[in-house]
Every structure is written in structure tokens, then in C-alpha cells.
């Protein structure tokens, strides 16, 4: 984006006032997926989040880094920065065909290299999960429970508190997908077909 107008600035301000909580129009549920933000010189596929230094072993709370470089336990939408970009550096397709004694195999693949993703599934299934339903085992095994413990996920707190967009859940995404596989046999040369 080269330049933003007042309407886009107003949209950013409106998202900031929601404190990182969004509402899914289809399910009418709260979600904490990073919002699209409009900023001059930034990609439309940029992932905006607050920088995280991980889980504090002493308290079990997430430790954030403000825009000014200060440590804090408080998530603030004003501290969001670009922590990744969903656009991959390289994408492409390739495939191969193989024929042998009447058998044939045709495949095609898609690849993407570089780029990041915000792992919303991990946020929803571990940190923002509803303990009354089936939950990921990491809810019990990966969370902070005692002082001095190094943990991947913060301690269990008030169920109304949601993990907001944080760099802890921005992950590199490179993948290879098999998009099609066709296996065949040519029966025209079989005796029973003649």
C-alpha cells in the first residue's frame, strides 16, 4: 500500500478498539485471529501481532515487547508490528507421467516456499479452548503450572481472557502438496478384450 486515506485509518482504529477480539459473522463467536491492517509500505497479507518473548517461567504469563522495546505482561494493540507475511517467496507446480507395460501413473504437485502463517488452530485448541469440551492434550501437558517451569503455553487463567495476536503463533510455512494422482491400466492389449 502506497498511501492510506482516512477511511482506512478509521478501520484500523476501530480494530484497535476491539483489543484484538474479532467476531466471526457466521458463528457469532469471538475470535482472536490477527486483523487485516492498512499501513503505508506494508503488504496486504502482512501478519500483525505483538512481539512475544515467550512464557515467563516465574509467573506463567506471556511476556511482550512493546514498540519502544520495553517488557510488559499487558497485550496492547498499539504494540502490534508486522511479524510475518502470508505471501510465499516461491510457488509453483510440477508433475510427472510414467507409462510401463500398459500401466500409467500421472501426478501433479504444488509447492510454496517461504512465507508465514498465524496458527489460529493452535491458539483456539490450546490457549483459548473451552475446558468443558474435548481439548488438545497440550492443554494439560504443555501449559505452565509451577514457578520456574519452562513452558510453551501460558498458565490457565480466567476463561473469559483470550490470547490475542502474538508472534508466538506466527510460524514459517513451506509445503509440498500432491494435488492429483491418476493410476491406470490400458486393457486394449489384453486377450479377453479382443
Feature annotation, model-predicted:
Residues 1-86:
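Conserved small-residue
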Residues 1-6, 101, 112-116, 188:
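Structural signature of outer-membrane beta-barrel domains
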Residues 15, 19-21, 70, 91, ...:
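Core subunits and conserved enzymes of cellular information-processing
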Residues 90-96, 103, 178-183:
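Hydrophobic, lipid-facing positions within transmembrane beta-strands of outer-membrane proteins
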Residues 57, 112-193:
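Extracytoplasmic gating/loop element in the C-terminal half of outer-membrane beta-barrel translocons
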Residues 1, 98, 107-111, 135, ...:
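Transmembrane beta-barrel strands of outer-membrane/channel proteins
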Residues 102-106, 190-191:
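Repeated loop/turn-to-beta-strand initiation elements of outer-membrane beta-barrel proteins
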Residues 82-83, 92-95, 189-191:
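Generic recognition of flexible, low-complexity loop/linker segments
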